[in-house]
Each structure stands twice: as C-alpha cells, then as structure tokens.
C-alpha cells in the first residue's frame, strides 16, 4: 500500500494538469515557451504517474483496469472483475 501522502500528491497533480490544460495549449500554439516555463511544474501532464486505484502502487499498473497487477490478480480470482476469467489452453 502506498503512503497516503504520495496518493494525495498525485491527486493534486491531476487537478493542476486539468486546471492549466487550456492555458498550456494556448501558450504552446503561440510558441511562448518563456511563459510556459513559468507555469507550475506539476501542471505538466508528463509529471503524472499512473497509480493503482485500490492500493496506490505506482508500478505494474494495468491501463485498462487502473489496477496494479497484484490487485488485479486478487480481484480476478475472486471473480469481482466483470468479463475476466482465468485463461486455459
């Protein structure tokens, strides 16, 4: 389980990215890179990391489910993810 502070920090980054998205787009179209550099660092979308919705784990996150591989496996074995079943061939 990730520290609560790390998860909160990531949520704050997501809010900043959403807040400054339009302004960033306008500045990029103008080519005003000086003004773009003066925006908050955390407002850049490249600073976002994908985290597990259940545990907050930053590594091994499956994009389609937004769960870490560990949380995905647990829920899949319990049958709590619709449409997912154990493969056999």
From Swiss-Prot:
Signal peptide: none annotated. Pfam families: Ribosomal_S14. One of its GO terms (molecular function) is rRNA binding. The keyword Signal does not apply. InterPro entries: Ribosomal_uS14, Ribosomal_uS14_bac/plastid, Ribosomal_uS14_CS, Ribosomal_uS14_sf. Keywords: Ribonucleoprotein, Ribosomal protein, RNA-binding, rRNA-binding. GO terms for cellular component: cytoplasm; small ribosomal subunit. GO terms for biological process: translation. Belongs to the universal ribosomal protein uS14 family. Binds 16S rRNA, required for the assembly of 30S particles and may also be responsible for determining the conformation of the 16S rRNA at the A site. Part of the 30S ribosomal subunit. Contacts proteins S3 and S10. This is Small ribosomal subunit protein uS14. It comes from Shouchella clausii (strain KSM-K16). The gene is rpsN.
């Amino acid at each position: 389980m990730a520290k609560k502070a790390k998860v909160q920090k990531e949520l704050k980054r997501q809010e900043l990215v959403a807040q400054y998205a339009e302004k960033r787009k306008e500045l990029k179209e103008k080519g005003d890179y000086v003004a773009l550099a003066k925006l908050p660092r955390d407002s850049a979308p490249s600073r976002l990391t994908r985290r597990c919705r259940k545990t907050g784990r930053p590594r091994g996150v499956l994009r389609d489910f937004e769960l870490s591989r560990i949380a995905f496996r647990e829920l899949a074995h319990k049958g709590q993810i619709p449409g997912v079943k154990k493969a056999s061939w």
